[in-house]
């Protein structure tokens, strides 16, 4: 926990830890933490990820942008021996290694989160509560992973109460002959949940997704 706090600059406990070593053409070791609490500046337009880059255990920079913006809440370190110790900022940005690290680290995080959702639904629900609105930015920013990200997404619905529903959950509960996913978008979750527009759907027992995050108007 102390190491996490020194890396993340936070005082909570990590909600999840991801540790792996990549070998082959590009070799590096990565240790990533998903914080247990939401940083106060999570939605700051200028906020960037803070993955610390090390070369042979020597700190180089925390501005290499090793994750996409929608994973900017993740904290951690990457250590590699495949760069020189005197590497310049320009060399870092132009290095094929950095692109490989970004792709590998992003893919690993996005593959570990569904496993966590299966193994510990409560822990994943907390992560989604804190960071779901940011992760959903990837639904319209990350074309490469647009087929993967919807499986991560969780939603409030007219049937979920205070809980979260996945699209898989929603599909499993479709009414007979229902072929569409219904949703309502607005600025306030409570207001759209009580919208008169939903009365007909409730009367027919049709579940509706309640989309109230700022990003929802962009990706639906």
Model-found features: residue ranges?
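Conserved GHKL (Bergerat-fold) ATPase module
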Residues: 1-220
């Amino acid at each position: 926990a102390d190491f996490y706090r020194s890396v993340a600059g936070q005082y909570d406990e990590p909600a999840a830890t991801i540790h792996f070593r990549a070998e082959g053409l590009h070799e590096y070791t990565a240790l990533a933490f998903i914080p247990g609490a939401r940083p106060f500046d999570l939605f700051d337009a200028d906020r960037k990820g803070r993955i610390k880059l090390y070369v042979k255990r020597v700190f180089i920079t925390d501005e290499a942008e090793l994750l996409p913006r929608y994973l900017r809440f993740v904290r951690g370190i990457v250590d590699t021996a495949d760069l020189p110790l005197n590497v310049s900022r320009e060399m870092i940005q132009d290095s094929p290694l950095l692109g490989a690290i970004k792709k590998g680290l992003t893919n690993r995080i996005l593959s570990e989160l569904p496993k966590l959702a299966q193994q510990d639904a409560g822990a994943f629900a907390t992560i989604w509560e804190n960071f779901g609105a940011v992760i959903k930015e990837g639904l319209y920013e990350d074309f490469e992973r647009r087929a993967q990200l919807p499986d991560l997404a969780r939603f409030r619905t007219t049937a979920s109460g205070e809980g979260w529903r996945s699209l898989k959950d929603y599909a499993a509960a479709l009414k007979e002959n229902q072929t569409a996913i219904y949703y309502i978008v607005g600025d306030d979750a409570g207001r759209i949940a009580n919208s008169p527009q939903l009365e007909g759907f409730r009367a027919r027992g049709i579940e509706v997704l309640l989309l109230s995050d700022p990003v929802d108007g962009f990706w639906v």
